[in-house]
A protein has these predicted regions:
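Domain-edge interaction signal
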Residues: 1-195
Length: 195
């Protein structure tokens, strides 16, 4: 099996659809780009794929050493365009989509492409602090040099508190939540043929 280059992984992340269902949906923010690459690399490697590129524990968790060079290379190849707004917006231009479809996609295992699409769909719309929390919780070894670990976990606790307060804000009792949860479990068990 040939290893997937980190440049090709970047191309796939930029190419695949996100929640909007459109090819080339943008990735907003350099930290988000770095963390999506990290989560995609680790997810693929956890499933037996080999991906080149070295992430190291750094100030904001896992950091790709070659990130700047890969961004520059992707721009020079025409598969990445960076727009500047409040944040950096990384997108694949139409010519880049055509190039990736012509050159890269025919060589990629469809299951690998599905995994990359799943990562983008699941994580691209998350706020940056939640995305950091996901990466920190899934791969804690990469947080040993983090300067923002406490901030990330405080942010996660804030989200959990808001989630716990949601039923009350919506006027739903705990009993209603438990009843709905039980019904959902029963339906799931029935679908699985267990109940």
């Amino acid at each position: 099996m040939t290893a997937l280059s980190i440049l090709n992984l970047l191309a796939l992340l930029l190419y695949v659809q996100g929640k909007g269902g459109n090819k080339g949906e943008p990735i907003v923010g350099k930290t988000k780009l770095d963390k999506l690459l990290f989560l995609a690399k680790m997810t693929l490697e956890d499933s037996g794929e080999e991906v080149e590129g070295e992430f190291i524990p750094y100030r904001q968790g896992a950091y790709l050493l070659q990130l700047e060079g890969i961004i520059d290379t992707a721009q020079s190849l025409g598969i990445l365009k960076i727009e500047r707004n409040d944040e950096l917006i990384y997108r694949m231009p139409e010519e880049g989509i055509k190039k990736v479809e012509r050159v890269l996609i025919p060589k990629i295992n469809p299951m690998l492409l599905d995994k990359v699409r799943e990562i983008k769909t699941k994580y691209n719309d998350l706020p940056e602090d939640l995305l950091l929390a996901v990466a920190y919780l899934k791969y804690p070894d990469y947080t040993i040099r983090s300067e923002i670990k406490n901030q990330v976990f405080r942010s996660l606790l804030k989200y959990l508190k808001e989630f716990n307060e949601l039923p009350e804000k919506l006027g739903i009792t705990r009993e209603d939540v438990e009843k709905l949860s039980l019904e959902a479990r029963k339906r799931t068990l029935k679908r699985l043929g267990i109940a």
